């Protein structure tokens, strides 16, 4: 389960994971963005990468399950995609997998009067992540991380 997810996102993750995994894909994570046009974004991956057809298959299966379960009370768009180069990070396992990589964090509550941080993932200890920012180690509670993405390098 993703750290820092809302109750709705936790419920959606539980509902969505089975059909995604049944199709042979990894559910990387989800985002539910509320607004005038709400969006449920599902990130999937596999060892062979993700094709447009894979996204369409997952979208079809997940739509059917969500129509039955009906956990979302507002109109929304469903998007299914690969994590991309700026891969979002949702779980402690994601941070562990990408130790030594550069990450951008947006915090729920500011630390040292900052909500945005960028640095190198140094360590993961349970619910805490250590990121080296400008040569100094900073420790963040995973539950305080609103959004995290790898920084692609070309």
Swiss-Prot record:
Location of this chain's protein in the cell: Cytoplasm
Cystine crosslinks: none
One Pfam family matching this protein: DUF150_C
Organism superkingdom: Bacteria
GO cellular component terms given for this protein: cytosol
UniProt main location, coarse: cytoplasm
Keyword vocabulary terms for this entry: Cytoplasm, Ribosome biogenesis
InterPro entries: Ribosome_maturation_RimP, RimP_C, RimP_C_sf, RimP_N, RimP_N_sf
Any one of the GO BP annotations: translation
HAMAP family: RimP (MF_01077)
Summary of the function given for this chain in its UniProt record: Required for maturation of 30S ribosomal subunits.
Family: Belongs to the RimP family.
Record-linked NCBIfam families: PRK00092.1-1
Family annotation (PANTHER family): RIBOSOME MATURATION FACTOR RIMP (PTHR33867:SF1)
Listed name of the protein: Ribosome maturation factor RimP
Organism: Yersinia pseudotuberculosis serotype O:1b (strain IP 31758)
